[in-house]
């Protein structure tokens, strides 16, 4: 297996399962209602806000992988559209899963030599650094989602 295939696999696994941590976004979010997803626990972000935030960066990098410019700004990364129904919540989840599948597929298509190239601009570092950054970022916020879910479900 070449390096881009391994990176794509690692990205898929944090979203859909099979990683060595045995924790993934899809399973962790299964059964979460829109009400639970939007429940505020102390000063923590909501589950929905974290899902949006993870996918905000996946979506931005996906556009670069598709040949477009990088257009992401940290100040907008938590600008979650209002979620007030099952339909709103499912729409966010479906976009997250679709973007994740497309993202992984495009990583697999990258030639390995591209991993050393500057990502969008030199200041952002290499493709390798950014792709792994997206995976690390997703794992980090997945951990938060799991903990917030436990707090909500146990009522503590």
Task: Label each region the model flagged.
Residues 2-4, 8-22, 26-29, 34-79, ...:
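Short, contiguous alpha-helical
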């Amino acid at each position: 297996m070449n390096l881009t295939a391994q990176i794509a696999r690692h990205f898929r696994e944090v979203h859909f399962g099979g990683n060595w941590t045995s924790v993934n976004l899809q399973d962790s979010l299964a059964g979460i209602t829109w009400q639970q997803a939007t429940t505020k626990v102390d000063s923590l972000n909501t589950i929905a806000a974290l899902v949006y935030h993870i996918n905000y960066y996946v979506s931005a990098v996906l556009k670069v992988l598709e040949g477009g410019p990088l257009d992401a700004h940290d100040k907008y990364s938590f600008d979650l559209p209002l979620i007030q129904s099952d339909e709103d919540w499912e729409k966010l989840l479906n976009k997250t899963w679709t973007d994740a599948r497309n993202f992984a597929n495009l990583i697999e298509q990258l030639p390995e030599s591209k991993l050393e190239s500057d990502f969008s601009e030199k200041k952002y570092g290499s493709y390798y650094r950014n792709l792994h950054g997206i995976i690390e970022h997703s794992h980090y916020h997945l951990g938060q989602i799991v903990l917030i879910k436990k707090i909500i479900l146990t009522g503590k």
